[in-house]
Regions:
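N-terminal signal-anchor/signal peptide hydrophobic helix marking the start
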Residues: 6-15
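Membrane-water interface segments at the C-terminal ends of transmembrane alpha-helices
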Residues: 22-30, 56, 70, 133-162, ...
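Hydrophobic alpha-helical transmembrane segments of membrane transport/permease proteins
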Residues: 15-66, 158-176
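An internal, D/E-rich "acidic patch" concept
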Residues: 57-113
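Alpha-helical transmembrane segments of integral membrane proteins
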Residues: 2-4, 92-127, 143, 167-307
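Residue-level recognition of pore/gate-forming positions within transmembrane alpha-helices
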Residues: 12, 20, 43, 109, ...
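Small-residue-rich alpha-helical segments with characteristic i,i+4
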Residues: 15, 122-137, 141-143
């Protein structure tokens, strides 16, 4: 296991550099960030030259990237164009988005897997058909429509929640935004769990467990569910980074000042330091999540061993 982890960590190094280089190049072709600072009016040439020198934009792109990566390994993600350190923005934004993501993952696991097990065991029954139709409707509706609808009904019309989340984003105010963020993924987890349960319940090891006279709940939890969760864990593991980076719409609707909000502001203002810095951390989240998912396979299925 130790050798496998070391090998995976070494494989993550070129992936990390390749992903950050790609993001760095994409952000640099968005436009001239100095022109974005000046707004509608044209920048004074002397002022523009001074700003380019201050932020290192007067150097070739490859040199900017090497300088940036060198600073990253010392914990310096640069300075935003408003003079604020990017690490300071991260310290304020990431805790909020992490809480929002944890709420979303909770809904995915509890509701998604529960409905998937229920429909997988009752495949072909009316409850199975109903849940499948509901998940299809959820997948078909865009996230911003779901968010605006719940905000209007629960927050504005009925007054059950605050229409906008407070600045400190307490956990109780993130329940509805977390449900909105998790809605589409929850539907996919339900359908994925259902398919996996329906296929594995006909497997030989399940029939053997039933033939031995094991209680039904033990057959489901210890044998059927454990082996059926492997594709679900894969989806949820990769979805962690997607939820953190894809929360832009949800955070905009509920006025949550998290990672999505900072990315939106960075892209809108062509603030390359902010965008590249936040995406660099999200790349690390993706890589670590994938590694943890691979290690979790061996826990769920004892037949899987890593040399």
């Amino acid at each position: 296991m130790g050798r496998y982890v070391i090998r995976r960590l070494l494989q993550m190094i070129p992936v990390f550099f390749g992903a950050t280089l790609l993001i760095f190049l994409m952000v640099n072709v968005m436009g001239d960030p100095i022109a974005g600072l000046c707004g509608d009016r044209q920048c004074d040439p002397a002022t523009a030259a001074q700003l380019e020198k201050e932020f290192g934009l007067d150097k070739p792109v490859w040199q900017q990237y090497l300088t940036y990566m060198g600073n990253v390994f010392t914990g310096d993600f640069g300075t935003a164009f408003n003079g604020q350190e990017v690490t300071e923005l991260m310290a304020n934004a990431f805790p909020v988005t992490i809480r929002l993501t944890l709420v979303a993952i909770f809904f995915e696991i509890v509701i998604g897997i529960s409905l998937g097990v229920l429909t997988g065991l009752k495949r072909g029954h009316p409850v199975d058909t109903t849940v499948l139709l509901l998940t299809l409707v959820v997948i078909a509706i865009p996230t911003f429509v779901t968010g605006l609808l719940l905000q209007l009904l629960l927050g504005v019309k009925w007054g059950w929640i605050k229409p906008a989340v407070s600045t400190d984003a307490p956990l109780d105010e993130l329940i509805v935004p977390g449900l909105v963020l998790a809605s589409v993924s929850l539907a996919y987890v339900t359908r994925l769990t259902r398919t996996s349960i329906a296929e594995n319940k006909r497997a030989d090891y399940v029939r053997t467990a039933v033939a031995k006279g094991l209680p039904r709940h033990r057959v489901i939890t210890r044998h059927l569910l454990r082996n059926s969760l492997i594709p679900v864990v894969t989806f949820i593991g990769t979805d962690v980074g997607a939820l953190m980076g894809g929360a832009i719409v949800t955070e905009r609707i509920f006025n949550i000042h998290g990672v999505g909000y900072q990315l939106y502001q960075g892209i809108l203002r062509q603030n390359t330091q902010t965008v590249v810095g936040f995406v660099t951390v999200l790349v690390l989240v993706f890589l670590v999540a994938n590694l943890l998912v691979d290690l979790l396979y061996a826990v769920l299925d004892p037949r899987i061993r890593y040399a």
